[in-house]
Amino acid sequence: GHAPRMGCMTAREPTLERLAVAESLLLGPYGLTERHLAAALATMAEHRIDDADLYFQSTRHEGWSLEEGIVKSGSFSIDQGVGVRAVAGETTAFAYRDDMSEAALLDAARTVRSIAAAGQSRRVKVGGVPQVAPAHVLYAPTDPIGTLDSTQKVALLEKVERLARAKDPRVVQVMAGLAAEHDVVMVARADGTRAADVRPLVRLSVTVIAEQNGRREVGSGGGGGRFGLGYFQDDVIEQYVDHAVNAALTNLESRPVP
């Protein structure tokens, strides 16, 4: 078989980097190679189809929170799967699976082929036990979850609390949350083109409660974006904390005391 055409994808270096990252996270751990993708696409092409593609996705999420001075590692989840789509005339057939083995891929491709052959547009969830990736979890260089270790994540939230309490003695309670997400997508089309996207997302939030004369008010601050946890340097944290504390104090001072 001829080598897959990359289209104009060689023009932008980051695109190739993203593709390499996606392949290492979405294909490598499950023993999938370019050969398996081509085989799955060829399986669908046995029926007359106008277009076909494979869609791989993995989303990893981690959350940490601080309350009452204690940091809890909240949630950690990995959501992943593969979707197979074929278009024949007016018909669109789509099947997806949670597991990403070679068998699952071919199974989904055969399901799509039979739907397309029957001439009905349908979406099908193909059975199979969700597959857990091999134990050594790979972090892409762009994965924000891997940019700080757990000790650093704890230290970051403790710093938020320390700064907030130091701002004003009326601050009686501090809650902080840290969330990181890494979304990797890869599409393989029947014409040989391959595309990938790697999207990190991080967020830091802080909520403070200030108390004066028995009355309590709440203020919050925070922010984030599509980058690593290294973004949360002292000046950024300071800004979020200032915003939260000032909001709580403004609320305290704005209402007349009866």
What role is predicted for each listed range?
Residues 2-258:
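Active-site bordering "gate/hinge" segments
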